[in-house]
């Protein structure tokens, strides 16, 4: 097993919307082969952070750096920041400043994949087709942007086989091989959630961002989701960044937890460290920190 190292570094991130400060001076890291949970009350700024990382928003201030390949490429971060370009890619790996990149470039070049709070499958396509469409970019390159595909040349046929093999692997992983030819919209809700994650994994992401993947799931479906995310972490060594309100899921699978409240980080550590942090308890109870002990005793915590 390779040692964990930083894949994502968020440094002094601030996002303002006019006079509203949604995120203020936030810094944290996400590591290779670990699950990092971003938690906090509604309106704490969690989804805004995701939108900054994935290129939907351009942060007001701060740096969002992502690395893949050899961790030694981090040594070039200062030089990249001083330049005017968004990335540095070489034989040893890539280094990216996500705040300088368009959302499609973050996904394609920096290899950041994302799911949303609301399921966004292609409901009329089959389950298999949803996984194949996620591999559109390599298939288009192999097709020569049409000509190789039209004539069925060997390079394109090889890419097709590879795409189907990858899709089949993920169908097996999420237990949906027998539903491969069914419309994705016909699947039960929990299966749709897992299919959406499998589709994201078909892009071979360095960083997988999941926005409330357990929302609306029953206990059995939540357990299946947890097993899938642990498998992604342990077998594929993908860095997972997770927003979730289901604390049973968070505490079961997370290696690292960051807590936001009113756009600011109030805690950062392991599950045990965070759940015993007075700042976190105060935020959850909606009281000042000095009132935590009295209120916790009153409610039986």
Language-model region placement:
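Helix-to-loop junction immediately C-terminal to a conserved catalytic motif
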Residues: 54
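The feature captures the beta-strand-to-loop junction immediately N-terminal to the Walker
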Residues: 39-41
């Amino acid at each position: 097993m390779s040692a964990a190292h930083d894949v994502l570094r968020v440094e002094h991130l601030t996002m303002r919307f006019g006079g509203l400060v949604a995120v203020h001076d936030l810094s944290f890291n996400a590591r290779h082969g670990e699950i990092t949970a971003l938690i906090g009350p509604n309106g704490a700024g969690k989804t805004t952070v995701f939108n900054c990382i994935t290129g939907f928003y351009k942060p007001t201030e701060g740096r969002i750096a992502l690395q893949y390949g050899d961790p030694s490429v981090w040594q070039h971060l200062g030089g990249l920041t001083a330049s005017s370009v968004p990335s540095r890619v070489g034989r040893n790996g890539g280094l990216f400043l996500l705040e300088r990149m368009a959302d499609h470039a973050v996904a394609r070049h920096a290899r950041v994949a994302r799911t949303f709070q609301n399921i966004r499958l292609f409901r009329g396509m089959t389950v298999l087709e949803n996984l194949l469409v996620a591999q559109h970019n390599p298939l288009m390159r192999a097709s020569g942007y049409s000509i190789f595909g039209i004539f069925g040349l060997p390079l394109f046929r090889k890419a097709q086989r590879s795409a189907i093999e990858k899709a089949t692997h993920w169908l097996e992983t999420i237990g949906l091989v027998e539903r491969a030819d069914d419309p994705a919209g016909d699947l039960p809700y929990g299966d749709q959630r897992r299919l959406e994650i499998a589709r994201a994994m078909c892009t071979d992401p360095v960083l997988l961002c999941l926005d409330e993947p357990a929302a609306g799931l029953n206990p059995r479906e939540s357990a299946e989701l947890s097993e899938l995310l642990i498998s992604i972490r342990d077998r594929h060594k993908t860095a997972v960044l997770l927003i979730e309100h289901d604390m049973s899921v968070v505490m079961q699978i997370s290696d690292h937890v960051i807590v936001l409240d009113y756009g600011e980080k109030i805690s950062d550590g392991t599950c045990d460290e965070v759940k015993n942090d007075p700042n976190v308890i105060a935020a959850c109870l909606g009281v000042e920190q000095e009132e935590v002990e009295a209120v916790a005793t009153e409610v039986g915590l």
